[in-house]
Amino acid sequence: MGSRFLLKIILLVILLAGVAAPSVARPSQSSPTSEYSIGRIIIKTTERKLLFVKGEKDIIEYKIAVGRQGREWTGSTSISRKVLNPAWAPPPKIRKDNPRLPALVKAGPNNPLGVAVLVLGDGTYGIHGTNRPETIGTFASYGCFRMYNKDILDLFSRVAIGTSVTVVP
């Protein structure tokens, strides 16, 4: 057996492991502090987790993908738009790195934004689904936050435009 064949088998096992163990939104045992007010989203990038503070002692935790090295960011913002079945116009930086990308990716199974996007602030970043679920739990994006499609739909139903989002290391 060649080393390339063995590498392909290992990659297949890793990919299947990610598919076989999808994220489950689950209540967290931790209690929110005053910083984590009800209705707020907290993103913990090093842990690759998004927390939605549902109630005083009720936090829903989602597994996410975050910005790769050099693309991470921290700070506070809010949800400025909510879009189901979004089209995506790749920004110039992403098109430069991926010249095969079209100027516009229509909604559907090939769209990197998945089934929904929560646009943050001025629109540079968002919390969105994905067409690459195997990347959830990794440092993979250009700064956006990827979720399993079922998880973004769950979060989408819980938040409104204006919801506060805090991104911490």
Give the role of each language-model region:
Residues 27-28, 36, 56, 70-71, ...:
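Exported/periplasmic cell-wall-interacting domains
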Residues 21-25:
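Sec/Tat signal peptide C-region and signal peptidase I cleavage site
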Residues 1-4:
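N-terminal secretory signal peptides that target proteins for export/translocation
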Residues 8-18:
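Bacterial N-terminal signal peptides
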Residues 27-71:
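N-terminal secretory signal peptides
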